[in-house]
Design a protein with these regions (language model features):
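Walker A/P-loop-proximal flanking segment of P-loop NTPase domains
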Residues: 2-88
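Conserved P-loop NTPase mechanochemical-coupling segment
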Residues: 11-15, 105, 109-118, 122-170, ...
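P-loop NTPase motor core
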Residues: 28, 34, 69-136
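Flexible phosphate/Mg2+-sensing switch loops adjacent to catalytic phosphate-binding sites
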Residues: 64-99, 213-216, 220, 224-230, ...
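Substrate-engagement module of ASCE P-loop NTPases
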Residues: 131, 172-184, 212-249, 585-588
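Structural recognition of the conserved hydrophobic beta-strand(s) that form the central parallel beta-sheet
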Residues: 189-193, 232-233, 249-256
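Amphipathic alpha-helical segments of the small helical/lid subdomains adjacent to P-loop NTPase cores
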Residues: 260-269, 274-335, 341
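Extended alpha-helical interface modules used as scaffolds for assembling large macromolecular complexes
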Residues: 271-272, 276, 325-584, 595, ...
Length: 618
């Protein structure tokens, strides 16, 4: 066992001072401070997928730049906090920027609600939290009475929460910037983290509310529309010029999507956007872990022998010239496994799915019921390891998702990390087009983790759709009386409507997907069946599925086969029935006097078709 002392892992830590003061492992992104803050753009927007470290980046910028109100322009705190980082090697830059700038930092990642009033109150709370950091200015002799009254309003939460005072919230950034300029004689730097979360949440709430209140003719789902209007006012500060009162010197913003410039960012000048398609090599590695950073991280925790396993499951993202890993995945993998390795328990090391179940899955799940035949083909190509082409919308709005436009859907998946650009197939001329122009691009699923997310969401959609169409009664009845045609009709319809996820990348048996497909469907039938078992010992083996129905008077045994060759279907179905009898899967049911009928089924799947053979055993 190694005697090496390992640094604490930065698990769930997106606060830079806490990470550094806690002596946590740190991937040094400090050289990007100079790249960003010597860039001539007035406003820089970085869009990257979730879990890629955007919040930590903003926190690092804030920690490096901000003035210490107790000792203005003294950078001793920063010298300690950034000790050992690469940026301290650039003395000229540090002298000019480190601890020398008034900074306003706000995160919008927790703004949520079920109606506009709740969204507003959540947003106002975030603004109050920021404004409270500047309460010390109330004692400043450089601010006049009206300045201090404005600050008092911003630091009084009960005042801000009243929706009739929303203009004060809209003007908050401009107000704070103006006050800081009076105090320090320098224009503030504005840092906004996850700017588009309120818009994404409002759009999703509109879609939910349309369903909840579909019978109310007076109801209008307008959360997103109102949030856009409100936030346009909040972002007005970005349109100021250096000579304007309350102007800022620079703004850095992060998010997942670039909302249409003709709405939220209308009138913003000298505006640079750095998306997952950006070709500016100076900034491609700023968010996320590069391949070299990831491999060093693994080596530092003595997991370098598992680099290829980590690459297979979590790599695959390509931002211009760099292979990128999601930091959330890398940190979780190391956190869960490095002690196993130290203890020699290498068989226990697992590559789990750390992406599944987070809120962004909603967009994929919501759209699945609207897949066209063309979309189905593209989805199938994706899960089979191929690239798909579509017109990328780089300036989309969250509310357009309700229109279920295919190109917007694929664009959303690319921006949120479900897909990554296929740079080899995408044309350089297309990529160089202006952000306002839709581009013809190629994209693919980046890795096995995301492939599993596609599979899981689509299987869940099968089950949900099954419930909505009340097919569970028909299916259980059909299985309970040997109605092969009804079973075939139900399955055929489902297979035609949805893409079949085949886990080819993991080289799993073809039956695995269809087995999961049936398990998902029967989950929605839980009130109609009892003693449902999957791969449960019965007779001399393990039938794929068994259950009882009709008050435990009927028993059903299912054996599943799959093939890519239609000509083999009849033979496989016959073999499936033979397997049930040869291995005596029915024996436990034969012994139960209450069971009056036993049905054996050989189900064979071939792509989007199936075959049902049935034999009554009792």
């Amino acid at each position: 066992m190694s005697n090496k002392q390992f640094l604490e892992l930065p698990y769930g830590k997106d606060d830079f001072p806490l990470l550094r003061e806690g002596n946590c492992y740190f991937v040094d992104k400090t050289p990007y401070l100079k790249t960003v803050f010597t860039d001539q753009s007035a406003v820089l927007l970085f869009t990257r997928p979730r879990r890629f470290g955007k919040t930590l980046l903003i926190s690092m910028f804030d920690s490096f730049l901000k003035i210490n109100p107790e000792k203005p322009f003294d950078n001793s705190k920063q010298l300690e906090l950034f000790k050992g980082t690469k940026i301290l090697e650039d003395k000229e830059f540090c002298d000019k920027f480190m601890g020398q700038c008034p900074v306003i930092t706000i995160t919008l990642k927790k703004v949520e609600g079920t109606n506009f009033k709740e969204f507003y109150e959540s947003f106002a709370s975030a603004v109050h939290k920021v404004a409270s950091r500047y309460s010390y200015l109330k004692n400043s002799d450089k601010l006049d009475k009206s300045d201090k009254e404005e600050l008092e309003n911003l630091t009084t939460k009960s005042y801000l929460l009243k929706i009739e005072n929303q203009q004060t919230v809209k003007d908050a950034l401009s107000t704070l910037s103006g006050l800081l300029y009076k105090e320090y004689g320098r224009r503030a730097i504005l840092l906004i983290d996850e700017y588009d979360v309120p818009l994404a949440a409002a759009s999703y709430r509109d879609r939910v509310n349309k369903v909840l209140y579909k019978n109310r003719h007076d109801f209008v789902a307008d959360c997103h529309e109102k949030m856009v209007a409100f936030m346009k006012g909040f972002f007005d500060l970005l349109k100021t010029t250096p000579g304007d009162e309350g102007a800022i010197s620079k703004a850095v913003i992060t998010g997942c999507l670039k909302e249409d410039k003709n709405s939220l960012f209308t009138g913003v000048n000298n505006f640079k956007v750095n998306t997952v398609l950006a070709t500016n090599k100076d900034l491609t590695g700023i968010i996320g872990f590069t391949k070299d950073e990831t491999y060093k991280f693994l080596k530092d925790y003595e997991l370098e022998n598992f680099s290829e396993k980590v690459k297979e499951h979590y790599d695959g993202y390509k931002f211009c010239d760099k292979e990128m890993f999601c930091p959330w995945d890398v940190v979780n993998f190391i956190d869960e496994n490095y002690k196993y390795n130290l203890n020699g328990e290498t068989d226990s090391i697992r590559t789990n799915n750390y992406w599944l179940g987070t809120t962004s899955d909603k967009s994929l799940y919501d759209y699945l019921g609207y897949l066209t035949d063309s979309d189905n083909k593209k989805m199938q190509d994706l899960v089979d390891g191929k690239s798909i082409s579509f017109k990328l919308n780089e300036s989309m709005n969250y509310d357009t998702l309700s229109e279920h436009n295919s190109d917007d859907f694929w664009s959303l998946l690319l921006h949120t990390g479900y897909l990554t650009l296929d740079w080899e197939k995408s044309d350089d001329e297309e990529l160089s087009k202006d952000h306002s122009t839709n581009k013809n691009v190629f994209a693919r699923i980046p890795n096995l983790e995301i492939l599993e997310c596609f599979s899981s969401n689509i299987k869940e959609r099968f089950s949900s759709d099954f419930k909505e169409r009340n097919l569970h009664n028909k299916l259980v009845d059909a299985f309970s009386c040997g109605n092969q045609k009804e079973i075939y009709d139900i399955f055929f319809d489902m297979l035609q409507k949805y893409v079949s996820i085949r886990d080819t990348a993991t080289k799993a048996p073809l039956e695995n997907y269809y087995h999961g497909f049936l398990n998902g469907i029967f989950t929605s039938c839980e009130k109609l069946v009892s003693e449902y078992h999957s791969n449960y010992e019965s007779g001399n083996g393990y039938p794929d599925i068994t259950f009882k129905a009709e008050r435990n008077t009927k028993a059903v045994i299912i054996e599943i086969k799959a093939t890519s060759n239609e000509e083999d279907m009849d033979e496989l179905a016959t073999n499936a029935l033979s397997q049930i009898e040869e291995k005596n899967y029915e024996q436990p049911f034969i012994k139960q006097s209450k069971i009056t009928e036993i049905y054996a089924y050989g189900l064979v799947f071939c792509k989007k078709d199936c075959l049902v053979f049935c034999k009554k055993l009792k």
